[in-house]
C-alpha cells in the first residue's frame, strides 16, 4: 500500500517530520523550523496533520507485528490533560519491559480497567501474573477478570515495589508538556509516541540503540 500517494511533499520529508515529533520533545513549530533550515518550507499545521494521519497507522502496523508477550504483565495508568481536564492513559508492559498496549479513557474506574485487561487477554492470551498498584478500581477489575477468564486466584499481585518498572516507563509521556485539544488528537498522537518508544526499547534491549533512527523505522513500517 502506498501511504504517500497524492502527497505534495516527498515521503522522506514526511517521515522525518513525523519521526522527530513522535520520538523527541519537539513542538510542531520546532519541526517546521528544523525543516526550513534544511530548505524545506512546511507549515507547522501541516506537520500536525501528518502526525494525526500517520501515528495511528504506525500503531496498527506495530500491533499486527507484535502479538507475543511474556506471561507476567505490569499494568498502570498515568494522567493526560485534554482541554484542561484530566484523562487516564492505561498502559501495560511485559516482564521484559516491552510495551503491550495502551488505552486512553476519560474515567479511571473498574469498568475502564476491566475493559483494558480484557483487551490484553484477547490479544496475548491469559497471563500467569498481573502486577498493578493498589488502586481500589484495579482490584475490583482484576477480581472480575480472574472470575471471567478462570485465572489462578493468586495471579494478581499489588506491589508498589514490583510496579516501579512501569511507573518509570511512563516518563516518555510525562516529560512532554503537550496540550491536547481533543480526545481524538490525544489518542492518535499517543499511539504514535508509544509505537516509536516501543521500537526504541526493543532496539535498546538488542544492543542496537546507537543505530536507532525513528525516521528509518517509520520508512520500513510504511514500506511493508
From Swiss-Prot:
List the source organism.
Answer: Staphylococcus aureus (strain Mu50 / ATCC 700699)
What name goes with this protein?
Transposase for insertion sequence-like element IS431mec
Q: What is the lineage of its organism?
A: Bacteria, Bacillati, Bacillota, Bacilli, Bacillales
What keywords are assigned to this protein? DNA recombination, DNA-binding, Transposable element, Transposition
Matching entries from Gene3D superfamilies are given as: Ribonuclease H-like superfamily/Ribonuclease H
Q: Can the keyword DNA-binding be found in this entry's annotation? A: yes
What Gene Ontology biological process does one annotation of this record name?
Answer: transposition
Q: Which NCBIfam families match?
A: transpos_IS6
Q: Which PROSITE patterns match?
A: INTEGRASE (PS50994)
Its domain of life reads: Bacteria
**The Integrase catalytic domain covers which part of the protein?**
73-222
List, in alphabetical order, the Gene Ontology terms for molecular function in this entry: DNA binding
Q: Does the keyword Lipid biosynthesis apply?
A: no
Q: Which residues bind DNA?
A: 33-52
Q: What does this protein do?
A: Involved in the transposition of the insertion sequence.
Query: What sections of the sequence does the record tag as coiled-coil?
Result: none
Amino acid at each position: 500500500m502506498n501511504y504517500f500517494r497524492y502527497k505534495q511533499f516527498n515521503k522522506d520529508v514526511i517521515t522525518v517530520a513525523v519521526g522527530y515529533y513522535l520520538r523527541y520533545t519537539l513542538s510542531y513549530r520546532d519541526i517546521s523550523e528544523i525543516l526550513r533550515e534544511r530548505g524545506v518550507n512546511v507549515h507547522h499545521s501541516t506537520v500536525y496533520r501528518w502526525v494525526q494521519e500517520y501515528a495511528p497507522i504506525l500503531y496498527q502496523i506495530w500491533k499486527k507485528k507484535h502479538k507475543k508477550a511474556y506471561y507476567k504483565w505490569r499494568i498502570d495508568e498515568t494522567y493526560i490533560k485534554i482541554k484542561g481536564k484530566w484523562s487516564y492513559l492505561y498502559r501495560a508492559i511485559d516482564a521484559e519491559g516491552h510495551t503491550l498496549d495502551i488505552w486512553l479513557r476519560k474515567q479511571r474506574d473498574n469498568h475502564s480497567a476491566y475493559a483494558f485487561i480484557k483487551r490484553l487477554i484477547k490479544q496475548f492470551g491469559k497471563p500467569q501474573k498481573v502486577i498493578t498498584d493498589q488502586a481500589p478500581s484495579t482490584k475490583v477489575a482484576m477480581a472480575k477478570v480472574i472470575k471471567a477468564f478462570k485465572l489462578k486466584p493468586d495471579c494478581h499481585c499489588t506491589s508498589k515495589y514490583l510496579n516501579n518498572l512501569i511507573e518509570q516507563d511512563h516518563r516518555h509521556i510525562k516529560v512532554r508538556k503537550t496540550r491536547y485539544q481533543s480526545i481524538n488528537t490525544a489518542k492518535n498522537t499517543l499511539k504514535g509516541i508509544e509505537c516509536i518508544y516501543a521500537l526504541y526499547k526493543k532496539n535498546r534491549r538488542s544492543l542496537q540503540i546507537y543505530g536507532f533512527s525513528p525516521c528509518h523505522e517509520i520508512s520500513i513500517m510504511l514500506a511493508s
